[in-house]
């Protein structure tokens, strides 16, 4: 009788199967779609539109928006003047790239609780981390439990994340960015 693939909740996209004996490389991609705004804005104030702006080619543009600002139609790259016209009462701060990088480095060090192989996603405009969990998942009760634990711990800190696991970096990255519920 063929072995069936275990049910995988949609919030954790996985290729090709979970909880199997490690036969190759398994890569976790974690994408933080609102990283910059979430590390700057206190969790209790996140219901209000908040943006980070930066100087770009002679004008101020939105470098990051929180979920509330996104719901109002604001998006990264938009001119700050246009954003103010749409949402005059939004909270605005200037982008500090060093702060975002330092916080991502701290998160990477914290994620070493799961594997020693943690690195930054170097794709431009993508705040994320890549973890090689090959041979580590069984220590946490399998891939599903490991990923659920990662997500829960990250979410408790008030950070939105999309997590996926696959056999290659590209597949895991694509699933985290464009997969179901990402």
Where do the language-model regions lie?
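Residues that scaffold, gate, or flank divalent-cation-dependent active/transport sites
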Residues: 1-130, 135-137, 144-152, 161, ...
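Secondary-structure boundary elements
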Residues: 156-158
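Long, highly charged, low-complexity intrinsically disordered interaction regions
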Residues: 164-182
